[in-house]
Amino acid sequence: MKQGFSFLLMLTILWSASSALAYDATLSTLWPLWDYRASDAADYKSTHLLGPLLKYETKGFETEYALRPLFYRAVDDEGVSETDVLYPLFGHKKEQDSSSFHILRLLTFDHGSPASGSRNRSYLFPFFFYGEEEQGKYKAFFPIHGTLYNWFGRDRISFTLFPLYGRTERKGTRIDNVLWPFFARISGENESGFKAWPIYGQSQKEGVYRKKFFLWPVFFSESLRLNTDNPQEVRAAWPFYIRKDSPKKSSRTILWPFFSKVENREKEYVTWNAPWPLVRVTKGDKYHGLKILPLFSDETMDVKRERWYLWPVYKIEEMNSELIMRRRDRVLFFLYSDVREVKYETGDSLRRIDFWPFFGYKNVNGVSHLHVLSLVEPFFPNNQSIERLWSPLWRVYQQKWDQQGNRVVSLLWNLYWSEKQGDRLAWELFPVIQYRKDSQAESDISFLKGLVRYRKGLDGKQLNLFYLPWGIHWGRDAG
């Protein structure tokens, strides 16, 4: 047993040493145990252990650690850090003047300087809330008692034994609820109202709006935006008849959702639905189209155009404006997606193709990345936490390249890998063969990690056998 272990240790040292020698101490591989790469010119070092499972990497001032899929951490010299544990279970982010963490986004702590984007709030949703806003500090223990500022689209929310009592405030309007949602009183500057839902309710603000309902949602009457140049009147006996009128837009609905007509005088188009949302006809200059779902749909809305063929089989979304061109083709929602985008002002370009679960492809400003497989990335296309912690576990093949011909390829987490940069080329199929070419005059080929190794350079040629550091040398300086 000891002799076998000693032999394995000796072979491991020889194999790693031969690899390092071949690459000027910038590369050492022993698949799948470890993979070490470094570049002094790029200020870069990377170590991977057990394929994609463990990672330690430094890039300039930033250091990354990963124990996939359990743990990921990135930190820089200024103490800014980001940590994920079994994403999305736990996450932590630290800036110079703020700190936040979350557990499943239900337990969240976020405190620091508002200038850094911190909300200065903590909560265990939906039970406990604590924070500080411009109005002051707040705390709440739902449904017992508490006050919230700037939550759920309201300036203030207060409650006691909810739904027994609750109060909301928004833009000067206060609503006191008793046995929510059944009874409420509305108050504010020049504003009053009440409701006994769903029987009857009314509210009004002088010169701004008037609202009434009876047997909600059957009968309701509303006068809205009275203080603007586009006031709106709404009358309804739902679902039999609904009328909406304003100087810029009018609509009529009969037996909702079967028949409706919308006339938009501001944007100069007319739309008929019969029934909504299956059949729709739109006529106008910048707004026009025909929809007959699930067979066909082709609708243009100013700079946007949307088409369906055999919904939900094939969909095309397009946007063409002075600033951007964007097109997305989709098959069965997330099964296949192809996005093309160009920003005219900056010249930035993007191409992204996802074919779930087989592969993903992305090209950003001429730099391409292809990976196989793609299990969850199509559903969360810009999620960096998934990219860092989960994606490397199932990406059995990756390739990156640019328009200058530089290329990096990895198969089965570097069982086979290749790198090309300018005239320099290196590749390896572990443990059979390893090859490097720095120029037309310099090359290095090794079999079984150095059992047989042949080098050619400006100083001549050399053959090494059996992992030995000395060998047969001939050529220019052989004598």
Where are these regions (language model features)?
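Positively charged n-region of N-terminal signal peptides that target proteins for export
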Residues: 1-6
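Bacterial N-terminal signal peptides
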Residues: 7-16
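Outer-membrane beta-barrel proteins and related beta-barrel translocases across Gram-negative bacteria
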Residues: 22-479
